[in-house]
């Protein structure tokens, strides 16, 4: 029987999985929400367990590899056996009180130098738990759960913790710190970390020979799902707004990520703003109905900065930046248009920021996430960005599954030679 691969996408509000065949066709996809929220690591594996056990047995019996992506920057302190110590600090949690310590640890040009980065959250966790066994990002912790071995970390997920993918070492003085033993052993995206734990495989009704492959971040997985060409930019319109594109060289700057994916540099940034702020005011049904009342060819006249809370990481890195959500007009449709225009402005500034750092401007933008299905928002973005905007319906879970498929194909090729 043809082998299959599994991708698991751990997002802000829940988990989605995707099963692909060797041709990359999507055979199965399902999702569920976290019971309590992103900060609860137990909910991560509970959601994964629920979705995996729901895969039809005719498919699950053929699985040979899996890969996980997670929210970039959500960090957890845990014991060496993986037991969480308190709650995780979500990616959106800035820790400005750690700024002075960051300056002593890493250069100002390091992606880890920002108080909105993972290193700042690590220092905050170390203040609460001075002797953790491990500090692990969301995807790395779930990989540990599958393996029952929490040693490993994938390089992209640890970028803003201070891992330098160009030098293959921790930035600055990080490795000299007393707590450096809590950091993961880094492996490149697409590397086979080991086989799924035998007892867990049986519990999940999975084959015991499944390989666990180092995945990537949730935003990188979305890009892989879009399968862009060199001239394309990719925007993920999820709870947060993520802009990525392939570049000839890595880009460097606060709030900027440069990851190696498929042998190429994938660079970009993620705003704290996104569709999450829309759901604060409207249900999905209301968003659909109100969007139909919007004329995207006419401006609302509103000038919003729709951040969910104080603080931004990209296109500007400012932990003190305040949201602007007023004045609110009487018309809900006009209010929604103002919010969508504000998000489009953030996106335009994001692409401009990447251009300032050396990236070519995208000739078109491929959109993913729930917001990509909104035609009025698409047109508002086209007007603001000045280029065509297309949609991709493949979920990020399918993107990270491509890494599992790549590892599976490389393993078979090596066996043939």
Q: Where on the chain are the PLM-derived regions?
A:
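Active-site core segments that coordinate phosphate-bearing ligands/cofactors
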Residues: 6-7, 103-112, 117, 123-137, ...
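N-terminal glycine/serine-rich phosphate-binding loop of ATP-dependent small-molecule kinases
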Residues: 1-87, 131-134, 184, 202, ...
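Short alpha-helix plus adjacent loop in nuclease-associated cores
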Residues: 89-107
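Short beta-strand-loop/turn "lid" adjacent to the catalytic site in phosphate-handling enzymes
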Residues: 57-92, 109-116, 139, 143-166, ...
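Glycine-rich, mobile lid/loop segments that gate access to catalytic sites or pores
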Residues: 191-192
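Short, conserved acidic/polar surface loops in the N-terminal third of protein domains
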Residues: 77-81, 100-103, 246
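A generic structural motif
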Residues: 32-33, 91, 248, 272
